[in-house]
Swiss-Prot record:
Induction: Accumulates in shoots and roots upon potassium-starvation. This is AAA-ATPase At1g43910. The chain crosses the membrane at residues 11-28. Expressed in developing shoots. The lineage of its organism: Eukaryota, Viridiplantae, Streptophyta, Embryophyta, Tracheophyta. Belongs to the AAA ATPase family. BCS1 subfamily. It is an enzyme of class 3 (hydrolase). Keywords: ATP-binding, Hydrolase, Magnesium, Membrane, Nucleotide-binding, Phosphoprotein, Transmembrane, Transmembrane helix. It is found in: Membrane. The modification Phosphothreonine is found at residue 85.
């Protein structure tokens, strides 16, 4: 018995061993934190968890990353849309809530997906656990986001064949009934699209355009939305391109809003002049969601910038030493090329994603590069023209709530004689809620434009006469 007790270590020996072990552990932990980068530590920890889980657990985990083969992972997107419906009964100490409704700060906040929190779902009696993870990165995107979906190993095939299909269909149904559309702008500093609630109330009902144009456009949009099988059968990407052109103030932006509200599509508003190069353009455009509108306004400005860059490049190439090709290449990597843009309009990259509408707007169609106007490049060219008698009456009905007035006939005659945009007419109609006052002001405005037009014509004719007399005197 004494021999047995003599083999038991003393308390001081145990405490000394514990102290030494703690010191070694603290030293090792300090070395890891100071020397090994955070990303590598997270990677090692993740691999260790995966390794031990595969041997000692009966669970199986699907990893669903945000990006997949250069584009947004549609399974990740479906999970983002679907999982908030599973949050109502979530038993956790935290819940992500928020609202982007700027016009109604008192609106009820919506539920978001919290990071590193388990979300429970059940599918045909199968227990599923979702977790959203986020890891910082120094690449194009400031963070890497991915979901873990965990289930029992025996249900792996069932989840692959049935659950993910159910997930996609559920997300599509939710998106088709969503309350708010969003408009996105690209934040270069954070390398990501940022959104705001899109609450433009223009619809095809309130849009003041000629009825034939309206009907043609609505029919075209409806056919496009139902044309998945058709586009697949003819081997074309499921997309549609519209070129809106015409003078400023003719309603191009309102037309875009009406299209978005009719189709229930989000809008991605891209300022193309700010894109650094074709590589960034590819990254930006492939990150847009399906069932969306890519809007590039004033495309002629982007074309002008492209031509200026090409001209400058030729001048610089001619004056630089041939022995510094790398320096020349680096100098001109800023700015996109027209070919890079066209690749996404109808080139190979146009097949990335589906059910997308591309809209270009311009005030000067004649300034566009001919490559943008070739047949098949933009499917529909829509002239947004000056105000017509029909558009005038539509605007009066909207703003003054009247369908007839004694001033209608003289104003319609003036509209046919003088070029005026719908924006100019609207501005005059909004000057007063009284129809008599507003229409009288519009008539005076058009009369003044007519007089000015006559004066300008007289000055121009006098100038031509003087030029002719000068030439005759010289001869």
């Amino acid at each position: 018995m004494a021999t047995l007790y003599s083999q038991v270590p003393s308390v001081s020996a145990v405490f000394s061993l514990y102290t030494s072990f703690s010191a070694i552990t603290m030293l090792f932990r300090t070395i890891l934190n100071e020397i090994v980068p955070k990303r590598i530590r997270e990677y090692i920890a993740m691999k260790a968890v995966d390794f031990f889980s595969s041997y000692f657990q009966s669970d199986f985990t699907f990893v669903i990353e945000q990006r997949w083969e250069f584009v947004e992972n549609q399974t990740f997107r479906a999970a983002e849309v679907y999982l908030p419906t599973c949050l109502a009964g979530l038993s956790t100490g935290k819940l992500l809530v928020g609202s982007s409704n700027l016009k109604n700060p008192a609106a009820e906040p919506k539920l978001g997906i919290p990071v590193n929190t388990k979300i429970i779902d059940n599918f045909e009696g199968i227990h599923l656990e979702w977790t959203l993870h986020s890891v910082e990165t120094k690449k194009y995107l400031p963070e890497k986001r991915y979901f873990h979906l965990t289930c029992k190993k025996e249900f792996r095939e069932k989840i692959m064949t049935d659950y993910f299909t159910y997930l996609a269909k559920s997300a599509e149904k939710i998106m088709s009934h969503r309350e708010n559309l969003k408009i996105y702008t690209y934040n270069q500093d954070r390398s990501k699209w940022e959104s705001a609630i899109f609450e433009h109330h223009t619809t095809f009902e309130t849009l003041a355009v000629e009825p034939d144009l309206k009907k043609t456009l609505i029919d075209d949009l409806d056919a496009f939305s139902k044309g998945k099988d058709f586009f697949k059968s003819v081997g074309r990407a499921w997309k549609r391109g519209y070129l809106l052109y015409g003078p400023p103030g003719t309603g191009k932006s309102s037309m875009v809003a009406a299209i978005a509200n009719h189709m229930k599509y989000h809008i991605y508003d891209l300022q193309i002049q700010s894109v650094r190069d074709d590589g960034e353009l590819r990254e930006i455009l492939t990150s847009t969601k399906n069932r969306s509108i890519l809007l590039i306004e004033d495309i002629d400005c982007g074309a002008d910038a492209s031509r200026r860059r090409q001209s400058k490049k030729k001048e610089e190439d001619g004056g630089e030493d041939d022995g510094e090709p790398q320096k020349r290449k680096k100098k001109f990597e800023v700015g996109i090329s027209l070919s890079g843009l066209l690749n996404f309009v109808d080139g190979l990259w146009s097949s990335c994603g589906e059910e997308k509408i591309i809209i270009f707007t311009t005030n000067h169609k004649e300034k566009l590069d001919p490559a943008l106007l070739r047949p098949g490049r933009m499917d529909v060219h829509i002239l947004m023209d000056n105000c017509t008698p029909f558009v005038f009456k539509k605007l009066v009905a909207l703003y003054l709530k009247t369908d007839e007035h004694v001033l209608f006939d003289p104003i319609e005659k003036l509209i046919l004689e003088v070029s005026s945009t719908p924006a100019e007419v609207t501005q005059q109609l909004m000057a007063s809620k009284n129809a008599d006052i507003a229409l009288k002001g519009l008539a005076e405005f058009l009369e003044n434009k007519k007089l000015k037009k006559g004066e300008d014509s007289s000055v121009e004719e006098e100038g031509e006469i003087e030029d002719a007399e000068t030439k005759e005197a010289e001869t």
